[in-house]
């Protein structure tokens, strides 16, 4: 089995590193494509031994399982580009927030009947094999496709199948969750520094506290509220600290953050379904394509428009 990534950003890097670290895939069995071969993640993938290409079609031809690891607004462009290259063997896995299975199936069905599509939502801790992933299978995906997906993604953390209509909520919770945790850790470390701790030690202690708390919860059958109560002695330091968090609306802020992420995911879904893309997104997509498709005698001007090079500067031997 070979795996391809359309997109060579943080998610592709995290999954590729997780798969190779888990031993489920050798690096030479992975290929990723990106129009920008100067990305830091591209360099990191290359050092791992992953094959890199600027051409999406090459990645499709190399792959059995194809991950669409690009921003939601790019998906319609990608499907139009690679649709004709999708074959019966391909399992197309979308990692794009808000992009529905039906919208992908509709696009691909214009090129080939019964495309095998899976939608997943994962997160970047897959890079250390502690990811949280859910997936939903499409109309034409086979039972074995779901099993293969679970085998792959269980190697890099927790993975389970859900109904597709739950994936937006998962995006708000665990998809965006690492960012909430990093923000909390940054603030905890600032608190430690304010009270006199060296920065490095403060970050390490905060991270270990959250890691330990998460493991305690996962290894017990107790409600998180009960575990919180177990730490809070009457009149002690912890209950006073919790009072400050409650006064600041800590719980409500987290609930609202999950809700905001979920709502934005649904907005992205609506935009993708209607193929509505912001002007800035269109400009970036076009510029990326121009970089790949420009003939040798053209160059990008500072404004982002293509301009013809003077004949004296064009490569020799081309009229």
Swiss-Prot record:
Record-listed NADPH binding positions: 8, 10-11, 34, 36, 56, 70-71, 97, 230
Binding locations of NADP(+): 6-11, 34, 56, 69-72, 95-97
EC number: 1.5.1.2
GO molecular function: identical protein binding; pyrroline-5-carboxylate reductase activity
GO terms for cellular component: mitochondrial matrix; mitochondrion
Enzyme class: oxidoreductase
Keyword Ubl conjugation: no
Known role: Oxidoreductase that catalyzes the last step in proline biosynthesis, which corresponds to the reduction of pyrroline-5-carboxylate to L-proline using NAD(P)H. At physiologic concentrations, has higher specific activity in the presence of NADH. Involved in the cellular response to oxidative stress.
HAMAP family: P5C_reductase
Protein name: Pyrroline-5-carboxylate reductase 1, mitochondrial
Record organism: Homo sapiens
Gene name as annotated: PYCR1
């Amino acid at each position: 089995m070979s795996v391809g990534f359309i997109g060579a950003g943080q998610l592709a890097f995290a999954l590729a590193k997780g798969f190779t670290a888990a031993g489920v895939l050798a690096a030479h069995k992975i290929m990723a494509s990106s129009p920008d071969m100067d990305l830091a993640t591209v360099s990191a993938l290359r050092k791992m031994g992953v094959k890199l290409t600027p051409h999406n079609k090459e990645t499709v031809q190399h792959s059995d399982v194809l991950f669409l690891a690009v921003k939601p607004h790019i998906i319609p462009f990608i499907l139009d580009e690679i649709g004709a290259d999708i074959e019966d063997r391909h399992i197309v896995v979308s990692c794009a927030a808000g992009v529905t299975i039906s919208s992908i199936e509709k696009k691909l069905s214009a090129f080939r009947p019964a495309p095998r599509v899976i939608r997943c939502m994962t997160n970047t801790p897959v890079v250390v094999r502690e990811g949280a992933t859910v997936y939903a299978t499409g109309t034409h995906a086979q039972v074995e496709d779901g099993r293969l997906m679970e085998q792959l993604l269980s190697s890099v953390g927790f993975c389970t199948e859900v109904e597709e209509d739950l994936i937006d909520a998962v995006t708000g919770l665990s998809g965006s969750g690492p960012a909430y945790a990093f923000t909390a850790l940054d603030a905890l470390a600032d608190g430690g520094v304010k009270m006199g701790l060296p920065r490095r030690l403060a970050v390490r202690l905060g991270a270990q506290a959250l890691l330990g708390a998460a493991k305690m919860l996962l290894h017990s059958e107790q409600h998180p509220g009960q575990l919180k109560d177990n730490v809070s002695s009457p009149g002690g330091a912890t209950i006073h600290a919790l009072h400050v968090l409650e006064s600041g609306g800590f719980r409500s802020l987290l609930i609202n953050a999950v809700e905001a992420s979920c709502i934005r995911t649904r907005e992205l879904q609506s935009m993708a379904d209607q193929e509505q893309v912001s002007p800035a997104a269109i400009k970036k997509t076009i510029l990326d394509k121009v970089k790949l498709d420009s003939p040798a005698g053209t160059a990008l001007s500072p404004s982002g428009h293509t301009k013809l090079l003077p004949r004296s500067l064009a490569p020799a031997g081309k009229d």
